[in-house]
């Protein structure tokens, strides 16, 4: 992995009791030893694989102001990280769920892009067996389950300050306001909404098919082409580019798909990340509620599956063998 660590430091937040959160600050940067390199590479892999939200700094963001000074050489990275950790402690102490953790600040370069990654990592207890086959306890950083992480694309922030996506973060587990305090600490707000962009794309595809007067088979083929392209982008870690997608679809007269979306005002970004759950709607219908879960390929609608909107009735012709066996066994019990 071509990941080069420029500067890295760790600090500690320790919860002494329900009311006290203590901060322990390191006095020097870490030496970039192999184990440190391995830790950052793992954190980079874990973070890159997770679904992220996009954001940007508020005008009054203290962190952004301090980071700008650090980037201009007016403050050292260590001093910047120490002051930021104290601010994080003060922000975190406002919340009843406040917990301690290891606070990581890492400035690194990956594929010619500079990043600042900030994370609060939990430690877990475990056991290990030594060479004498004795069992001992140990503690480790729970990087795979880290959910308090933000990453600033320093390159984009400095070259495109009006961007809505130079800051990414994890929204945290359901039921915890993790992202709330972290966003307050960062002085940031949500920017590009990937789900909204992907839903807008789906609507644009449907409208494009309608405007092109496509029949049912042509519409299904069009949706499959869109899904195929978007899924390839998702798998390769690339973004959806409207100009590239337009090359996969037949034009509407003298107008391609990208021109169609611009003229109709869908407000889609030229490029944006793919959202797996939203794009799945191109290929499948699914829903659940009231003890019922339904999931089927979109191409089956009108062939084996029929919906009557007047009575809100779904008719299925030909059930899956395993479902049919279960139903037959239940009927035979009567």
Swiss-Prot record:
Pfam families: NA37 (PF04245). GO terms for cellular component: bacterial nucleoid; cytoplasm. The keyword Nucleotide-binding does not apply. GO terms for molecular function: double-stranded DNA binding; single-stranded RNA binding. The keyword NAD does not apply. InterPro entries: Nucleoid_associated_NdpA (IPR007358). Keywords: Cytoplasm. It is found in: Cytoplasm, Nucleoid. Belongs to the YejK family. NCBIfam families: PRK00378.1 (NF001557). This is Nucleoid-associated protein PMI0825.
